[in-house]
């Protein structure tokens, strides 16, 4: 099985506040709090671990509260490689009112110097081999030149590492320069990239194929939420449906879990259709857990049996 790595330059403590009702400009009361060490790459590694796949999570940690972050990674049994820097790991706060949609508040993070990025890059390049899988996920922290991050990713790809990029820090031109194995843009990014909205599955499939043809990635996967997902390599496209969830608990982290599913199945050498069915099963099952908690293996299995390639 191929080795899997994740890279998180911008981790966060994910705080989830559940409440009966939220009203702006009023005092609001919280019924329960859930706190997880997160960041997109960490979420991917955690989803993999819960579903029986090991990975190594490279992560930059602020010294002020990094010990608490590491304690949670150890609790979850994750294999991780930390790079320490001055400052404090940020917090992402999500309000979950029972009677309305969730609201997210993101705090700022530490600054990362080029020297810290170089230290992380050396650690990653020392272990990654041709054919290994790596997910670079989350936005770039302050202090880094985007060109330096692009150069890091290009070196990985030049060494034969199959790189997924899931970050809103890059423009279409940046992605064309990086040319990763896979990207998973959201609807806003697609509009930004192509100038046209996605209104249905066929629109999404066309958009995915167009992005590949423009050279932004070898493959493009677009999530349609509860309506499934599409995938294209520019030549072939697949549209997948997923079962409807009567009462989804939280959609936060579902995209990260979807990518975990891609890595989980690809590392095992499974065929394209099975990889994509696994991916949407991970993502859908993640909506059945609180906050950014990973999808349970039994839920993934149940959902997988109900996925379809249309």
Report residues per predicted region:
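Gly/Ala-rich phosphate-binding loop of Rossmann-like dinucleotide-binding domains
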Residues: 49, 157, 267
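Short beta-strands and strand-loop turn motifs
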Residues: 104-106, 131-139, 166, 184-187
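Substrate-binding N-lobe of the ribokinase-like
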Residues: 29-89, 306
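Positively charged, low-complexity intrinsically disordered leader regions
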Residues: 1-23
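Conserved phosphate-binding/catalytic region of the ribokinase-like
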Residues: 173, 201-310
């Amino acid at each position: 099985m191929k080795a899997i790595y994740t890279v998180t330059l911008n981790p966060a403590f994910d705080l989830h506040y559940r409440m009966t009702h939220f009203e702006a400009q009023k005092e609001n009361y919280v019924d329960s709090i859930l706190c997880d060490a997160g960041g997109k790459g960490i979420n991917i590694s955690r989803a993999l671990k819960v579903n029986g796949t090991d990975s190594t999570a490279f992560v930059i940690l602020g010294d002020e509260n990094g010990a608490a972050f590491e304690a949670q990674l150890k609790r979850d049994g994750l294999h991780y490689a930390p790079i320490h820097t001055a400052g404090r790991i940020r917090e992402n706060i999500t309000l979950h009112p029972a009677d309305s949609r969730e609201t997210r508040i993101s705090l700022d993070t530490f600054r990362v110097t080029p020297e810290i990025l170089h230290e992380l890059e050396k650690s990653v390049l020392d272990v990654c081999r041709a054919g290994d899988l790596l997910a670079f996920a989350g936005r770039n922290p302050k202090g880094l030149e985007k060109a330096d991050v692009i150069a890091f990713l290009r070196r990985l790809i030049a060494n034969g590492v199959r790189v997924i990029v899931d970050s809103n820090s890059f423009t279409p031109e940046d992605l064309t320069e990086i040319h990763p194995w896979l990207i998973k843009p959201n609807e806003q990014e697609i509009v930004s990239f192509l100038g046209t909205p996605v209104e249905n599955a066929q629109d999404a499939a066309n958009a995915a194929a167009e992005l590949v043809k423009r050279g932004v990635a070898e493959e493009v996967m677009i999530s349609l939420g509860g309506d499934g997902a599409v995938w294209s390599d520019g030549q072939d496209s697949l549209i997948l449906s997923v079962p409807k969830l009567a009462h989804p608990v939280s959609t936060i982290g579902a995209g990260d879990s979807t990518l975990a599913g891609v890595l989980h199945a690809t590392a095992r050498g499974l065929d394209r259709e099975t990889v994509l069915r696994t991916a949407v099963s991970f993502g859908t099952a993640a909506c059945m857990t609180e906050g950014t908690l990973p999808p349970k293996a039994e839920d993934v299995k149940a959902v997988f049996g109900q996925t379809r390639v249309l």
